[in-house]
């Protein structure tokens, strides 16, 4: 019985050595990251950017859907209004030290202003530098969706004269007090 245990121990040692030698010459799965670039898919959720339309205007309409859907509340924004009535984000900031890169903000954005790109180099030495403001997030191009324009698809006209058209609609209204018994 003792000899049997010694023989099985010897066989397991030989098997371990053979396994090591067979893996020495096989293809290595580990990539040396800084020297060899990683091949990330286009759907990889990395750096968050704010995109612009093809005409250069910001896509964000400050609807607050991104901050409402964020599970860790890392997005905060303040809205303001242009002269033509269009809303825009006066200030927009994302705390990347809290962000879990879930992509819910990208899915909730109706204008496709927020997009997650396959960029993974987000490390900083100080935690305060992970608070990205609007100037850090703005991207010069349209991002992944170059042909998407929210205002042409939704049919919203920002040059609508409310006072002029409201007076026309009021004059066509029926006085409901005449219908009462």
UniProtKB/Swiss-Prot annotation:
Domain 4Fe-4S ferredoxin-type: 51-80, 90-119
Subcellular location: Cell membrane
Binding-site list for [4Fe-4S] cluster 2: 70, 99, 102, 105
Cofactor(s) recorded in Swiss-Prot or TrEMBL: [4Fe-4S] cluster
Pfam family, one: Fer4_7
Keywords annotated in UniProt: 4Fe-4S, Cell membrane, Iron, Iron-sulfur, Membrane, Metal-binding, NAD, Quinone, Repeat, Translocase, Ubiquinone
Cellular component annotations (GO), alphabetically ordered: plasma membrane
Domain of life: Bacteria
Record-stated family: Belongs to the complex I 23 kDa subunit family.
Function (record text): NDH-1 shuttles electrons from NADH, via FMN and iron-sulfur (Fe-S) centers, to quinones in the respiratory chain. The immediate electron acceptor for the enzyme in this species is believed to be ubiquinone. Couples the redox reaction to proton translocation (for every two electrons transferred, four hydrogen ions are translocated across the cytoplasmic membrane), and thus conserves the redox energy in a proton gradient.
Protein name, per record: NADH-quinone oxidoreductase subunit I
Organism per entry: Buchnera aphidicola subsp. Cinara cedri (strain Cc)
């Amino acid at each position: 019985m003792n000899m049997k245990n010694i023989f099985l121990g010897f066989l397991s040692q030989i098997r371990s050595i053979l396994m090591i030698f067979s893996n020495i010459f096989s293809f290595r799965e580990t990539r040396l990251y800084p020297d060899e670039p990683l091949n990330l898919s286009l759907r990889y959720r990395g750096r968050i950017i704010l995109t612009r339309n093809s005409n250069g205007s910001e896509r964000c309409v400050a609807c607050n859907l991104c901050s409402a859907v964020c599970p860790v509340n890392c997005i905060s924004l303040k809205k303001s209004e242009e002269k033509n009535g269009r809303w825009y984000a006066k200030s927009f900031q994302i705390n990347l030290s809290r962000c879990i890169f879930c992509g819910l903000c990208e899915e909730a954005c109706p204008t496709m202003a927020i997009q997650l790109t396959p960029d993974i180099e987000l490390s900083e030495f100080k935690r305060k530098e992970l608070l990205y403001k609007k100037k850090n997030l703005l991207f010069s191009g349209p991002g992944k969706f170059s042909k998407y324009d929210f205002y042409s698809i939704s049919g919203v006209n920002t040059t609508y004269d409310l006072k002029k058209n409201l007076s026309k609609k009021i004059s066509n209204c029926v006085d409901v007090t005449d219908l009462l018994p």
